[in-house]
UniProtKB/Swiss-Prot annotation:
This is N6-methyladenosine RNA methyltransferase MTA1. Belongs to the MT-A70-like family. Transmembrane segments: none annotated. It catalyses: an adenosine in mRNA + S-adenosyl-L-methionine = an N(6)-methyladenosine in mRNA + S-adenosyl-L-homocysteine + H(+). GO terms for biological process: methylation. N6-methyladenosine RNA methyltransferase that plays a crucial role in fungal phenotypic traits, virulence, and stress tolerance. Mediates the methylation of mRNAs to produce N6-methyladenosine (m6A)-containing mRNAs. M6A is a modification present at internal sites of mRNAs and some non-coding RNAs and plays a role in mRNA stability and processing. Required for appressorium turgor pressure and regulates autophagosome formation during appressorium formation stage. Residues 53-78 are annotated as: Disordered. It comes from Pyricularia oryzae (strain 70-15 / ATCC MYA-4617 / FGSC 8958) (Rice blast fungus). The keyword Membrane does not apply. Disruption phenotype: Affects vegetative growth and conidial formation and results in increased sensitivity to various stresses. Decreases pathogenicity and activates plant host immune responses. The lineage of its organism: Eukaryota, Fungi, Dikarya, Ascomycota, Pezizomycotina. It is an enzyme of class 2 (transferase). It comes from the Eukaryota. InterPro entries: DNA_methylase_N6_adenine_CS, MT-A70-like, SAM-dependent_MTases_sf. GO terms for molecular function: methyltransferase activity; nucleic acid binding.
Length: 376
């Protein structure tokens, strides 16, 4: 298992992932990642055995499900195909929850590093059970871990980024980038709730806008011969159809065929879905479509067709890093590209107008951990 993986079913269809840890681990090459119980991202050590690790600042984990109003007039009718698709996903996530309750007895997340402004002390002890102890901001740790404080951003090893809109920087990327074994996209799907959020990320305005934007992404020119494409999408049937329609879908336009339909199921700290599974208004999961070039002879394990990634959600718009989930199907030292990225990954490229968002030092702290070997 990877460092961020807390549980994986024997058939591989269910993976319990710690979301912040998946992003922390992606700041290093896979070979440098430690086990879940060990400190992550060790950047410096002191003579008394104290190690400093770079930790991602997270939001408090949800302890109870969200309350969301259902439509007063009931749900809008869905096409038959969309109804079947939703029922299949619902069955998958229900099965994933049952798998966890039956075969897993550990925690559903690792200790989180909360923002200093949210750490409420009570008699000198933090009251949030999920806060990582012994933390400081990068400025106050600068004399201990100077390598983490140079410049405004933290850059993972061998990471590359192209900052700008797709339209403005497409030529630059095509001229400078290699072909990629895996391409991950997190498009800015039109989303009213994202528009309402203060400081929310940029989203497309209309369905026509997002289609034009995706059509402008040169996937055929960027993808290696046997490469994979993973694309996040909302639960809106029109967007799923926009991607997968055999007649005029974006995947078909890119010369790709669908090989996997994964789901990211968001749960509370006690493994309850953050929203009712049968909610007509909002779903507790997000689809992740996996595709490859048409005619590819690659053979996938059975669990790749339908897989459920389970995790406790974090800050809005922050998704699990899936590098270590797709790596087993890729050649060693594969090259990856994340499009519409908001953070960087070691050894990968990132492309978009907000690629450095979560790489800012303000999103990270240095946390102290004592060496068990010395007891200091």
């Amino acid at each position: 298992m990877t460092a961020a993986t807390l549980f994986e079913s024997t058939d591989g269809t269910v993976v319990l992932l710690d979301l912040p840890r998946s992003i922390e681990d992606a700041q290093q090459h896979p070979a440098a990642v430690t086990l879940p119980e060990a400190p992550s991202l060790v950047t410096n050590s002191c003579r008394d055995g104290t190690s400093w690790t770079r930790r991602l600042i997270s939001s408090p984990p949800p302890e109870t499900p969200f309350v969301t109003p259902e439509p007063k007039n009931g749900p809008s009718p869905l096409p038959a195909a969309a109804q079947v698709a939703q029922l299949m996903i619902q069955a998958s996530v229900t099965g994933a929850l049952e798998e966890l309750r039956t075969n897993y007895s550990g925690p559903y997340l690792l200790p989180r590093q909360l923002s200093p402004q949210r750490m409420i002390a009570d008699g000198g002890k933090a009251v949030d059970d999920y806060k990582s102890p012994h933390a400081c901001d990068l400025e106050s740790c600068s004399t201990t871990a100077e390598d983490a404080t140079k410049g405004r951003y933290y850059f993972p090893p061998e990471s590359h980024h192209v900052l700008g809109t797709i339209q403005e920087t497409k030529t630059l990327l095509l001229q400078s980038a290699p072909n990629f074994n895996v391409i991950v996209l997190d498009p800015p799907w039109p989303n009213r709730s994202a528009k309402r959020k203060k400081g929310g990320y940029k989203v497309a305005t209309t369905t026509d806008d997002i289609r034009a934007l995706l059509s402008d992404v040169p996937i055929p020119s960027l993808l290696a011969r046997d490469g994979l494409v993973a694309i996040w999408v909302t639960n809106k049937p029109a967007f799923l159809d926009m991607l997968t329609s055999p007649r005029d879908g974006i995947l078909s336009e890119w010369g790709l065929e669908l090989v996997g339909e994964w789901s990211w199921l968001k749960i509370t700290t006690s493994a309850e879905p953050i929203l009712p599974i049968d909610s007509a208004h909002r779903k507790p999961w997000e689809p992740l479509l996996i595709a490859q070039r048409k005619g590819s002879k690659r053979v996938f394990p059975p669990f790749w067709r339908r897989r459920v990634i389970v995790s406790v959600p974090d800050t809005h718009s922050r998704k699990p890093n899936i590098r270590d989930l797709v790596n087993p199907m890729l050649p060693p030292r594969s090259r990856g590209l994340e499009i519409f990225a908001r953070n960087l990954t070691a050894g990968w490229w990132a492309w978009g107008d907000d690629v450095l968002h979560f790489q800012e030092r303000s999103n990270w702290v240095m946390a102290e951990s004592k060496s068990p070997a010395t007891g200091c």
